[in-house]
Each structure stands twice: as structure tokens, then as C-alpha cells.
Curated annotation (Swiss-Prot):
The name this protein goes by in its record: Small ribosomal subunit protein uS17
InterPro entries per UniProt: NA-bd_OB-fold (IPR012340), Ribosomal_uS17 (IPR000266), Ribosomal_uS17_bact/chlr (IPR019984), Ribosomal_uS17_CS (IPR019979)
One GO BP: translation
Gene Ontology terms for molecular function: rRNA binding; structural constituent of ribosome
Xref: CDD domains: Ribosomal_uS17
Organism this protein belongs to: Erwinia tasmaniensis (strain DSM 17950 / CFBP 7177 / CIP 109463 / NCPPB 4357 / Et1/99)
Annotated gene: rpsQ
Family affiliation: Belongs to the universal ribosomal protein uS17 family.
Pfam families: Ribosomal_S17
Keywords: Ribonucleoprotein, Ribosomal protein, RNA-binding, rRNA-binding
Domain of life per record: Bacteria
Amino acid sequence: MTDKIRTLQGRVTSDKMEKSIVVAIERFVKHPIYGKFIKRTTKLHVHDENNECGIGDVVIIRECRPLSKTKSWTLVRVVEKAIL
């Protein structure tokens, strides 16, 4: 069996933890009755080994084995640094 590793792109919302960041993933969901597309956000805890991310950065993450109670994603790369 060939399992594809899940990768997602999102924006960093918190970098206060040591070697961890919180990434917000935005997706659009169609309302079942009215048909309007609604923006939904999911927050994921991500392992950042080198503490290279800051708030507002756009990053690519991939799924991995559970690293803690809430962390099961790791940082692949920073796509765009935030303008501060």
C-alpha cells in the first residue's frame, strides 16, 4: 500500500512555546441548506525543531507520529516570512 503523507499550508498564530508553534488552517465549507461557502479554521500544534517560525509566517506542515498529547505535525518549510 502506498500511503500519502498529509501536508497542509497555514499561518502561524503562536510561537510562545519552546520548539512548538500553533498553525491555523483555513478551509471553505459549503452550507448544506443555503449553499454559501463559510470559512472554517482549524488550529494544529506543530513541532518546530529549530524555532525558526514567527507569528504570521506561512508554513507547510506534514503529519507524523504523535510527539505529545496534542502534537502530531512537523514543520516542513517556511513559505513566506511575516512582514513586521
